[in-house]
C-alpha cells in the first residue's frame, strides 16, 4: 500500500485542527471502502496524509430532534438500512442504503463518504435531496449550512473547502400522509453501482389528489436535482398510470436537455421514464415499510477508542500500537499504519484462512467478523480495529472440532475448491447469530457479497439453512 502519514482524531475540533494544518493534501478515512482501494493501487488521487475520523463519536448516529432528523456522517449504510426511525419517517433513505454494495460494504461505508465522494451513482443522495436535506460543514473558522443539492459542483467535486469537514446531515420529517419509494437499476442485485435510480415522494390531499410531489433521479443528470417540470405535471391531479407515465417522459426529456445525446442515451431515455413511473406507482402501492436487514447495533465509533494518534509530520507511515481481541485472544500489536487487516491476519498473525482475492471488496473471500459484523478485511485499515473484536474462520470452532456451519457445509457438499468457503462461513455466522431460521431470500442476501465460482450457490444456501435449524 502506498505510504502515507496517518493521523487519528477523536473530536471534531481535533479533525478541524488537522485539516487546517494539512488541507488539500489530506483525505478523510471513515469506512475506507473507496480510499483503501486508491491507496493500494497507488492512485494519483492517493493522499500524503490520511486523517482517520472513524473514532469521532459525535459524528455518528441517527437522532430525532423535534420536527427534524439528523444523521451523523459516520453512520454506516447498514445502520441506515435497519433504522426504525427512518423506517417510520424516511423509508426511501433506508431502501437506498440497503441497495448499496454488499453486507460487508454496508457495514463499513458511511453516509458522509457517500455524499462527499459526489459520484453521480451515489444511492443515498437522491432520497436525501427529495427529503430536503441540508448539510453542515465545519472548519476552525466556524460552521456553515447549505442545501445538500447546492453542495455539488459536478461529479466528484463539492463546494466544501479543503479545511472543511461534513459534520451533520439534517432533513425535516415528512408529513404523515407522505409516501415514498426508491428504485435502483444495476447489473445485479448486489455489488453493483446504479446505472440509473429514482427517489420519489408523493403526498395526497383528502380528495385523493396529489398535493406534493418530488422526483430526484440518480446517475441521470450531471448533478442531482429535483425535476420540477415533471413534479408540476402531478400537482392537483388524481394519481394514475397515464399521469405517472407522462411524468416519466418529462423526466426523460429533461435529462436529454441537460446531457445531450450520448452513447448511453438510447438506453437511458426510455428506462428512466419507466423507473420514474414505477417509483410513483410504488409510492401509492405500499406504505414504504420493509423488513430490517440486520439487528440493530451501536455505531462503530461508539465501540471504544479507534485508531492511534501519531505526530503531525510528513514522514513515511509510522508504526502504530493497537490492542484488539482476535479469535478470543487479547493482543497488543505494533503494525505499520498503512497495513490493512487482511495483511495483518495472514502475514503477521499466521492466520491464512482469510483469503486474499480481489482486494477491492468485491469477492468476499477475505470476510471476517468485526464486532459481529461481516466486513471485507482488505478494506479495513489495521489501526481501526483498536478496541474491537475480530473473528476469523480459525476462531469459529474449538480446537480440534467443527462449527455446526462447517459440518453442514461438508454434509451438503457446499465447499468445492474451498477458496470462498472461509468468507462464506463468516457471512453465514453473522446471519444465523441474528436469525437462526432465515428464509431462502435472507440467506441469499446475507451471502450476496461472497462470490463462489464452483457450486452455483444452491448447496451453500441449503447448508446454511440446515445449520440454522434446531436439533
Where are the regions a protein language model picked out?
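C-terminal structural segment of proteins
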Residues: 1-315, 320, 325, 369, ...
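Signature of N-terminal electron-transfer/Fe-S-associated modules in redox systems
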Residues: 10, 68, 75-76, 230, ...
Amino acid at each position: 500500500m502506498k505510504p502515507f502519514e496517518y493521523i487519528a482524531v477523536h473530536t471534531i475540533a481535533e479533525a478541524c485542527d488537522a485539516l487546517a494544518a494539512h488541507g488539500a493534501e489530506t483525505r478523510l478515512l471513515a469506512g475506507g471502502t473507496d480510499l483503501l482501494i486508491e491507496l493500494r493501487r497507488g492512485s494519483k488521487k492517493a493522499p500524503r496524509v490520511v486523517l482517520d475520523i472513524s473514532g469521532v463519536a459525535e459524528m455518528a448516529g441517527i437522532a430525532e430532534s423535534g420536527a427534524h432528523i439528523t444523521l451523523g456522517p459516520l453512520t454506516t449504510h447498514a445502520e441506515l438500512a435497519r433504522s426504525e426511525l427512518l423506517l417510520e419517517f424516511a423509508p426511501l433513505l433506508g431502501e437506498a442504503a440497503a441497495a448499496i454494495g454488499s453486507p460487508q460494504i454496508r457495514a463499513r461505508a458511511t453516509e458522509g463518504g457517500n455524499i462527499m465522494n459526489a459520484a453521480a451513482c451515489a444511492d443515498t443522495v437522491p432520497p436525501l435531496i427529495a427529503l430536503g436535506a441540508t448539510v453542515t460543514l465545519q472548519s476552525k473558522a466556524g460552521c456553515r449550512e447549505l442545501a445538500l443539492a447546492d453542495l455539488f459542483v459536478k461529479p466528484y467535486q463539492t463546494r466544501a473547502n479543503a479545511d472543511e469537514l461534513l459534520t451533520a446531515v439534517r432533513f425535516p420529517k415528512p408529513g404523515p400522509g407522505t409516501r415514498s419509494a426508491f428504485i435502483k437499476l444495476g447489473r445485479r442485485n448486489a455489488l453493483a453501482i446504479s446505472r440509473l435510480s429514482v427517489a420519489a415522494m408523493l403526498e395526497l390531499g383528502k380528495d385523493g389528489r396529489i398535493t406534493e410531489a418530488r422526483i430526484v433521479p440518480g446517475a441521470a443528470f450531471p448533478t442531482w436535482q429535483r425535476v420540477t417540470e415533471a413534479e408540476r405535471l402531478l400537482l392537483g391531479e388524481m394519481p394514475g398510470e397515464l399521469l405517472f407515465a407522462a411524468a416519466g417522459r418529462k423526466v426523460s426529456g429533461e435529462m436529454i436537455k441537460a446531457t445531450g445525446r450520448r452513447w448511453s442515451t438510447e438506453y437511458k431515455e426510455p428506462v428512466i421514464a419507466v423507473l420514474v413511473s414505477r417509483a410513483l406507482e410504488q409510492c401509492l402501492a405500499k406504505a414504504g415499510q420493509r423488513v430490517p436487514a440486520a439487528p440493530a447495533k451501536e455505531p462503530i465509533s461508539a465501540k471504544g477508542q479507534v485508531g492511534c494518534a501519531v505526530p503531525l509530520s510528513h514522514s513515511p507511515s509510522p508504526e502504530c500500537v493497537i490492542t484488539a481481541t482476535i479469535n478470543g485472544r487479547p493482543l497488543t500489536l505494533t503494525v505499520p499504519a498503512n497495513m490493512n487487516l487482511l495483511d495483518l491476519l495472514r502475514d503477521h498473525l499466521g492466520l491464512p484462512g482469510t483469503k486474499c482475492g480481489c482486494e477491492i471488496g468485491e469477492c468476499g473471500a477475505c470476510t471476517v467478523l468485526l464486532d459481529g459484523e461481516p466486513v471485507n478485511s482488505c478494506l479495513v485499515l489495521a489501526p481501526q480495529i483498536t478496541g474491537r473484536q475480530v473473528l476469523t474462520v480459525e476462531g469459529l470452532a474449538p480446537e480440534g472440532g467443527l462449527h455446526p456451519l462447517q459440518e453442514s457445509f461438508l454434509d451438503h457438499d457446499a465447499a468445492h475448491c474451498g477458496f470462498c468457503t472461509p468468507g462464506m462461513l463468516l457471512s453465514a455466522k453473522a446471519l444465523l447469530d441474528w436469525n437462526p431460521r432465515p428464509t431462502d431470500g435472507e440467506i441469499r442476501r446475507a451471502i450476496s457479497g461472497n462470490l463462489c465460482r464452483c457450486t452455483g450457490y444452491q448447496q451453500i444456501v441449503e447448508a446454511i439453512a440446515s445449520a440454522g435449524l434446531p436439533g
